[in-house]
Amino acid sequence: MAWTSLILSLLALCSGASSQAVVTQESALTTSPGGTVILTCRSSTGAVTTSNYANWIQEKPDHLFTGLIGGTSNRAPGVPVRFSGSLIGDKAALTITGAQTEDDAMYFCALWFRNHFVFGGGTKVTVLG
């Protein structure tokens, strides 16, 4: 439930926020069952750091949102270990290791800038199977 509250808070904070920062993600990625896929999240302001508290949120086709990762690398309770968050170079990353067909979804990154989060446009992950 705490993660649901976090997601709702993030959406509320970001809905009216204006920022010069732009967060970009790959528009789409494809993998096979059992494969590994790495999603990245880039900031227009420079390198993403732990101070950006990267969050990763999954949206299933039925519009069910699930918080996966908070604070760059902290997996939410109940989230499978195949999901991991990290920094790779100057970007935040979400790695899905051993992808399953149920991981076919949209994934959104949100980065913290001073006093609000800025969301990326989302990455559609397709798991062929």
Curated annotation (Swiss-Prot):
Modified residues (Pyrrolidone carboxylic acid): Q20
Entries under PANTHER family matching the protein: IMMUNOGLOBULIN LIGHT CHAIN (PTHR23267)
Signal sequence, start to end: 1-19
Matching InterPro entries: Ig-like_dom, Ig-like_dom_sf, Ig-like_fold, Ig_sub, Ig_V-set, IgV_Light_Chain
Further facts: This chain is from a myeloma protein with anti-DNP activity.
Amino-acid biosynthesis found in the keyword field: no
Protein name, per record: Ig lambda-2 chain V region MOPC 315
Domain Ig-like per the UniProt entry, residue ranges: 20-125
